[in-house]
Curated annotation (Swiss-Prot):
Changing D32 to A/E: Reduces nick joining activity by 99%. This is DNA ligase. Residues 593-671 form the BRCT domain. Changing D285N: Reduces nick joining activity by 99%. Changing D117E: Reduces nick joining activity by 97%. One of its GO terms (biological process) is DNA repair. Belongs to the NAD-dependent DNA ligase family. LigA subfamily. Changing K290A: Reduces nick joining activity by 87%. It comes from Escherichia coli (strain K12).
Length: 671
């Protein structure tokens, strides 16, 4: 007679086998009812013997309790995005760039896949067992969705087969088939629940549930398309070979993956998929085209946040016709005035569209748009609604000219348009309510001053009630004043006050980024902070001095110089410092007096480090007299390459710049 352990092992093995046949091979051998019977038998045995339950059991897909919030997972290898092409000419230009970059006229073959319209995820297996899963997030850090991913039956909790790597990070797309999407919405309408606009939104909403039991009820599925971390094992040296190996281990791969021998075959694949698109049963918005050879991929490298060896060939966006009811003008954080078309609502690609951006005055002139016109609306990339053209043959007689404002629609200040720029801007600065709201929202955001609990709606109310006019006013708020806001009780109000107090202790780089200087993002702010060290030195810097900072050109230097030249901005900064905003004093370093191999050198870090964080490494390098830059140029003296170094390493090699690895960096730091 079999032992309980043997029965459990056999049931789990049988169920995993049938999950593989159903989800990966699309060739089920048993009816659903038989699968359900086996699952019930396993569940009953595990209920009687809970001490024998294993984490990879098919019964353990459903989490037991909701989470309070998602924690973060940092991607060991960044999840990069892809560049897009939208027509054959652009694809052929991409193909030529690839051919030109490869030496010796090497033959290029292409692995072509469907571009699924879902949610990109990363799944980590250790010794074949699923241990974590994360969303793409910002490409560097994503949300921990492990409990939810475990509920998706297409994703194996344990890989099967031989030669499975010790650590394998699989990347792919979670999506919702059309039939499942329609059923979710049908159930929602019947029960008065939330109706989703399209399958992608439904997939994202299902996967980002704090309660995995809800995710388990949604018929999500998954196809894998790539690899991140790979340790303690090997994979084939072609992209297609890797996908086929994934399939052998039990991971689902689309059966539409195709190897193409030429650009002509790629175009034929694209048109065939476009033709079949309505019958696939799930949403796609194009095809993904990748160089098949891993060696060639490595040779081609990366640029910015995308590989040079892959591209997304998007399908033409879906279009509809409707009428322009009116054109209104919105004011953004930097004073940019953007015209927005208010439309007769129309469904485009499954979404009800009632507004579309018109970008600027030049675009209105190019379109020849008048209020009342019949227009063609497109969801560019199936996401952002835009006006494609005016249907002049059906123009009504009572259309009206669109008049671009000469004064800000919010504060009445003059509108100016700098010669050579397409964007018109309000000159009202912080006296403009619209700019004030957006500036304050940026100021408190996570990557800026990081004021926890200070959401957009709170900022809106604070500005509308005239409690806050400048960022410094935020630090004068009391719990009593906040309690008067909508949905803000005494406890929540005190939490916000505490968060503001905590935010006073920041870094020079975060403070600069929070000020919202035009063209100054996080990387530029960090570069300015590292180079000048103190606010006083930065405020006094000339445009010429500012351009000595790595990655700062004449445009950014001018914006920074003009910002600090404006008295109202200096006054706001003084108020912030008076309210207690502060950061650690810089370590004053004279590179000439430091006996260090890094002294006086411009250094760039790339890839992931295993022995210390990037921030710690930067701090140590600066202490030893280095200037740490964000990108590689002819001014770069040294590149430190960690794991999965990408385009920066390739550029350094191209320019003949010295490159060292993490081990050598640590040795030099120790010396």
């Amino acid at each position: 007679m079999e032992s309980i352990e043997q029965q459990l092992t056999e049931l789990r093995t049988t169920l995993r086998h049938h999950e593989y046949l159903y989800h990966v091979m699309d060739a089920p051998e048993i009816p659903d009812a038989e699968y359900d019977r086996l699952m019930r038998e396993l569940r009953e045995l595990e209920t009687k013997h809970p001490e024998l339950i294993t984490p990879d059991s098919p019964t353990q897909r459903v989490g037991a309790a909701p989470l309070a919030a998602f924690s973060q997972i940092r991607h060991e290898v960044p999840m990069l995005s892809l560049d897009n092409v939208f027509d054959e000419e652009s694809f052929l230009a991409f193909n030529k760039r690839v051919q030109d970059r490869l030496k010796n006229n090497e033959k290029v073959t292409w692995c072509c896949e469907l571009k699924l319209d879902g949610l990109a995820v990363s799944i980590l297996y250790e010794n074949g067992v699923l241990v974590s899963a994360a969303t793409r997030g910002d490409g560097t850090t994503g949300e921990d969705i492990t409990s939810n991913v475990r509920t998706i039956r297409a994703i194996p909790l344990k890989l099967h087969g031989e030669n499975i790597p010790a650590r394998l990070e699989v990347r792919g797309e979670v999506f919702l088939p059309q039939a499942g999407f329609e059923k979710i919405n049908e159930d929602a309408r019947r029960t008065g629940g939330k109706v989703f606009a399209n399958p992608r939104n439904a997939a994202a909403g299902s996967l980002r549930q704090l309660d995995p039991r809800i995710t388990a009820k949604r018929p999500l599925t998954f196809f894998c398309y790539g690899v991140g971390v790979l340790e303690g094992g090997e994979l084939p040296d072609t992209h297609l070979g890797r996908l086929l190996q994934f399939k052998k281990w039990g991971l689902p791969v689309s059966d539409r993956v195709t190897l193409c021998e030429s650009a002509e075959e790629v175009l034929a694949f694209y048109h065939k998929v476009e033709e079949d698109r309505p019958t696939l049963g799930f949403d796609i918005d194009g095809v993904v085209i990748k160089v098949n050879s891993l060696a060639q991929q490595e040779q081609l490298g990366f640029v910015a946040r995308a590989p040079r060896w892959a591209v997304a060939f998007k399908f033409p966006a879906q279009e509809q016709m409707t009428f322009v009811r009116d054109v209104e003008f919105q004011v953004g954080r930097t004073g940019a005035i953007t015209p927005v078309a208010r439309l007769e609502p129309v469904h485009v690609a499954g979404v009800l569209v009632s507004n579309a951006t018109l970008h600027n005055a030049d675009e209105i002139e190019r379109l020849g748009l008048r209020i009342g016109d019949k227009v063609v609306i497109r969801r560019a990339g199936d996401v952002i609604p835009q006006v494609v053209n005016v249907v002049l043959s059906e123009r009504p007689e009572d259309t009206r000219e669109v008049v671009f404002p000469t004064h800000c629609p919010v504060c009445g200040s003059d509108v100016e348009r700098v010669e050579g720029e397409a964007v018109a801007r309000c000159t009202g600065g912080l006296i403009c309510g619209a700019q004030r709201k957006e500036s304050l929202k940026h100021f408190v955001s996570r990557r800026a001053m990081d004021v926890d609990g200070m959401g957009d709606k709170i900022i809106d109310q604070l500005v509308e009630k005239e409690y806050v006019h400048t960022p410094a006013d935020l630090f004068k708020l009391t719990a009593g004043k906040l309690t008067g806001l909508e949905r803000m009780g005494p406890k929540s109000a005190q939490n916000v006050v505490n968060a503001l107090e905590k935010a006073k202790e920041t870094t020079f780089a975060r403070f600069l980024y929070a000020l919202g200087i035009r063209e100054v993002g996080e990387a530029t702010a960090a570069g300015l902070a590292a180079y000048f060290g103190t606010l006083e030195a930065l405020e006094a810097a000339s445009i010429e001095e500012l351009q000595k900072v790595p990655d700062v050109g004449i445009v950014v230097a001018s914006h920074v110089h003009n910002f600090f030249a404006e008295e109202s901005n200096r006054n706001v900064i003084s108020e912030l410092l008076a309210e207690g905003v502060h950061w650690p004093a810089p370590i004053v370093i004279n590179a000439e007096e430091i006996d260090s191999p890094f002294a006086g050198k411009t250094v760039v870090l790339t890839g992931s480090l295993s022995q210390m964080s990037r921030d710690d490494a930067k701090a140590r390098l600066v202490e030893l007299g280095a200037k740490v830059a964000g990108s590689v140029s002819k001014k770069t003296d040294l590149v430190i390459a960690g794991e999965a170094a990408g385009s920066k390493l390739a550029k350094a090699q191209e320019l003949g710049i010295e490159v060292i690895d993490e081990a050598e960096m640590l040795r030099l730091l120790g010396s």
